[in-house]
């Protein structure tokens, strides 16, 4: 029953599963247990999270699974919110709907959202797209681009565990060795976010330095989120960029 409870909780708090489909899945899970478990599960309520309203999310996952298995490219359209709080297909400057041709490699869940890890055909790097925002997807006959040929791949096959550890916010940019200084109260937060592969050094009663190989934009966002308790030390280009960005933020709040 405890295992079923964990599965049901994952349905309740998942942002990538539409509410109606989540309810159906929960009923199926409940049917695997006894009446006592069902009487307890009625008292479990989800937080008021913003859930996807894309009813085709499972179809998208099935198509992407098939394309990954066959090593084929896919074509899709991509949606985003506008100020009317509704999803709209992304368009080109001429007003036509923009189409994306990509090679899919993996799908992963991060912070309750399903992401597609792929290569956008025009470039030689890695891109991440929200699966619930994909529309009108179809598999193409064209063979996909091998992951080993991409920039930043190191000519190695994709390691999903390593990729997720280095891309904590699912940004697609270059990885780097980053060193930052934190207050010691944040040690647990750092390990939760970056894993136990981090290295600690230069420890004092109040602060410690952290070194980690991570996506550079993720490190930048982390430092902004937790400033001034996190200070980037290296690389210098990232430290300089953060200093300039924080200066602009300060100026934006000046009267």
Predicted feature locations:
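Loop-centered beta-sheet repeat module
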Residues: 65-127
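Polybasic (Lys/Arg-rich)
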Residues: 157-255
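Flexible linker/loop signature enriched in Pro/Ser/Thr and Pro/Gly
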Residues: 123-160
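Structural motif
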Residues: 106, 113, 133-135, 229
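Short, basic/aromatic recognition patches that contact phosphate-bearing ligands
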Residues: 1-13, 95-96, 101, 204, ...
């Amino acid at each position: 029953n405890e295992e079923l409870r964990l599965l049901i909780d994952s349905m309740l708090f998942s942002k990538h599963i539409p509410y109606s489909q989540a309810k159906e899945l929960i009923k199926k899970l409940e049917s695997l247990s006894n009446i006592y478990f069902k009487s307890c599960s009625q008292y479990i309520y989800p937080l008021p999270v913003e859930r996807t309203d894309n009813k085709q999310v499972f179809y998208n996952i099935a198509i992407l699974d098939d394309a990954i298995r066959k090593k084929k490219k896919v074509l899709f359209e991509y949606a985003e919110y506008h100020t009317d709080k509704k999803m709209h297909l992304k368009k080109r400057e001429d007003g036509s709907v923009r189409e994306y041709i990509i090679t899919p490699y993996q799908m992963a869940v991060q912070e309750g959202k399903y992401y597609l890890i792929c290569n956008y055909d025009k470039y030689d790097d890695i891109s991440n797209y929200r699966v619930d925002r994909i529309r009108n997807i179809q598999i193409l006959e064209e063979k996909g681009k091998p992951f080993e040929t991409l920039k930043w791949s190191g000519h190695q096959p994709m390691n999903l565990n390593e990729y997720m550890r280095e891309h904590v916010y699912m940004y697609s940019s270059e990885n780097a060795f980053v060193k930052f200084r934190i207050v010691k109260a944040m040690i647990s937060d750092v390990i939760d976010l970056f894993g136990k592969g981090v290295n600690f050094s230069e420890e004092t009663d109040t602060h410690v330095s952290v070194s980690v190989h991570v996506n550079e934009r993720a490190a930048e966002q982390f430092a902004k989120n937790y400033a001034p308790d996190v200070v980037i030390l290296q690389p210098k280009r990232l430290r300089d960029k953060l200093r300039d960005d924080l200066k602009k933020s300060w100026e934006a709040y000046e009267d």
